[in-house]
């Protein structure tokens, strides 16, 4: 999972063939349900699915805590509604992974209490730097999550794209929404945050550690 250079900070949607910038984070939403999938407890690769669902659940939980911290500081400011809209989508992501945890009997990471505290602290701490700091955090985190989701998509495509079709569609949908949040952060002056390049690199290093640990613990 690489950290993109802050100087250029390209719009990540351009890296996706056929991506359409006009689909905003507040636009049309696609419902994904596990109704006709070939995925069952008997025919899936339990190790792969457990790992994917556990880490994604942890990531969406952490993202929710980050936005909660940002709203605690900036909720009454002009950027509050923007943050709230992104947070609402993250709540939907977390709800879906909560359902998948039950459906596929996946235990959560033992690090949930830690992500609870650190996520809120990261959100509130960067928000104390102002709108730009909060948006820099959003750009860093959402970029990391999008790269992580891309890695999972490659893994499932190599495993069995037909069997995991609906899980693939879900991850792709969430990946696209994270990229939209990334672009919203750039549109709201993330790059004007104090020491933007350093801040982004530190946050993304933390994301890589969190992903590594949540997959395994």
UniProtKB/Swiss-Prot annotation:
Q: What is the effect of changing residue 28 to A?
A: Reduces nuclear localization. Increases level of reactive oxygen species (ROS)
Q: Which domain of life is it from?
A: Eukaryota
The Swiss-Prot or TrEMBL record lists the needed cofactor(s) as: Fe cation
Detail which positions bind Fe cation 1.
60, 90, 93, 178
Write down the EC number. 1.14.13.253
Task: Please report the record's description of how this protein sits within the membrane.
Answer: Peripheral membrane protein
* Pathway it works in: Cofactor biosynthesis; ubiquinone biosynthesis
Q: Region 2 X approximate tandem repeats: which residues?
A: 48-217
Q: Which UniProt keywords apply?
A: Chromosome, Disease variant, Iron, Membrane, Metal-binding, Mitochondrion, Mitochondrion inner membrane, Monooxygenase, Neurodegeneration, Neuropathy, Nucleus, Oxidoreductase, Primary mitochondrial disease, Repeat, Transit peptide, Ubiquinone biosynthesis
Record InterPro entries: Ferritin-like_SF, Ubq_synth_Coq7
Q: What is the effect of changing residue 178 to K?
A: No detectable ubiquinone is produced
Binding residues for Fe cation 2: 90, 142, 178, 181
| Top EC category | oxidoreductase
Example GO CC term: the record gives: chromosome
Q: Impact of altering residue 156 to R?
A: In HMNR9; uncertain significance
Disulphide bridges, residue numbers: none
Q: Which reaction does it catalyse?
A: a 5-methoxy-2-methyl-3-(all-trans-polyprenyl)benzoquinone + NADH + O2 = a 3-demethylubiquinone + NAD(+) + H2O
Q: Where is this region: Required for nuclear localization?
A: 11-29
Q: Indicate which residues the UniProt annotation says bind NADH.
A: 51, 212, 216
Effect upon mutating residue 54 to W? In HMNR9; uncertain significance
Protein's job: Catalyzes the hydroxylation of the 5-methoxy-2-methyl-3-(all-trans-polyprenyl)benzoquinone at the C6 position and participates in the biosynthesis of ubiquinone. Catalyzes the reaction through a substrate-mediated reduction pathway, whereby NADH shuttles electrons to 5-methoxy-2-methyl-3-(all-trans-decaprenyl)benzoquinone, which then transfers the electrons to the two Fe(3+) centers.
Subunit annotation: Component of a multi-subunit COQ enzyme complex. Interacts with COQ8B and COQ6. Interacts with COQ9.
Q: Which disease is it linked to?
A: Coenzyme Q10 deficiency, primary, 8: An autosomal recessive disorder resulting from mitochondrial dysfunction and characterized by decreased levels of coenzyme Q10. Patients manifest neonatal lung hypoplasia, contractures, early infantile hypertension and cardiac hypertrophy, secondary to prenatal kidney dysplasia, with neonatal and infantile renal dysfunction. Clinical features also include progressive peripheral neuropathy, muscular hypotonia and atrophy, and mild psychomotor delay with hearing and visual impairment.
Q: What protein name applies here? A: NADPH-dependent 3-demethoxyubiquinone 3-hydroxylase, mitochondrial
Organism, per UniProt?
Homo sapiens
């Amino acid at each position: 999972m690489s950290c993109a250079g802050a100087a250029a900070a390209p719009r990540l949607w351009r890296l996706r063939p056929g991506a359409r910038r006009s689909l905003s984070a507040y636009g049309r939403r696609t419902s994904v349900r596990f109704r006709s999938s070939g995925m069952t407890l008997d025919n899936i690769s339990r190790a792969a699915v457990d790992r994917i669902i556990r880490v994604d659940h942890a990531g969406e939980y952490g993202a929710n805590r980050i936005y909660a911290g940002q709203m605690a500081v900036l909720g009454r400011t002009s950027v509050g509604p923007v943050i709230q809209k992104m947070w609402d989508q993250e709540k939907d992501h977390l709800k879906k992974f909560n359902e998948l945890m039950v459906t596929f009997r996946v235990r959560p990471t033992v690090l949930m209490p830690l992500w609870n505290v650190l996520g809120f602290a990261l959100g509130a701490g960067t928000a104390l730097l102002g709108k730009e700091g909060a948006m820099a955090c959003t750009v860093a985190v959402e970029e990391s999550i999008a790269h992580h989701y891309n890695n999972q998509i490659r893994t499932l495509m190599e495993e069995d794209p037909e069997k995991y079709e609906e899980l693939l569609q879900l991850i792709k949908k969430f990946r696209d929404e994270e990229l939209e949040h990334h672009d919203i952060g750039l549109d709201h002056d993330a790059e004007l945050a104090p020491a933007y390049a350093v801040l982004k690199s530190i946050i993304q290093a933390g994301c890589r550690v969190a992903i590594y640990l949540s997959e395994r613990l």
